[in-house]
Amino acid sequence: MPVAHPVITHVIYDMDGLLLDTEPFYTQATQAIVARYGHTFDWSLKSRMIGKKAIDSARILVETLRLPIEPEDYLCERESMLVELFPTAKAMPGARRLTEHLAHHGIPRPWQAVHTGEITN
């Protein structure tokens, strides 16, 4: 007896790092901010921040480097840099092929930008 496969009716994308290569922008923005205070943003610090909520990562950064800014101020500044950088993001391998395939089959595909929570078509 053949196995029935579920029918895909909708797809919601996480743009950051799935369809667009945005990860380097977070590092670039953070490095630019901490450099103003005489610090570098290295892997030992970044690895402690990955996977956490933005505010928790910001606290780790500010406290570890003893930056003279509040975590919220860092996030605000980083966000303004990301807004400038994101339009230059390159598609991840296979992203265009996947989105074109879904479009060809009429599957709605809204996407979400995780850093803002914005969902759009």
Describe these PLM feature segments.
Residues 2-47:
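Active-site neighborhood of HAD-like aspartate-dependent phosphohydrolases
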Residues 7, 84-117:
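Short, acidic loop-to-helix structural element flanking the phosphoryl-transfer center
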Residues 16-21, 53, 106, 115:
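Conserved functional loop/turn residues at catalytic and ligand-binding sites
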Residues 25, 49-53, 77, 90-94, ...:
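Short beta->alpha linker loops
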Residues 30, 58-61, 95, 120-121:
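Hydrophobic packing residues within well-ordered alpha-helices of enzyme cores
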Residues 38, 62, 83-86:
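Short amphipathic alpha-helical interface segments enriched in basic and hydrophobic/aromatic residues
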Residues 39, 67, 107:
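Short glycine/serine/threonine/alanine-rich loop segments
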Residues 51-81, 97-104:
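A metal-dependent, Asp-based hydrolase signature
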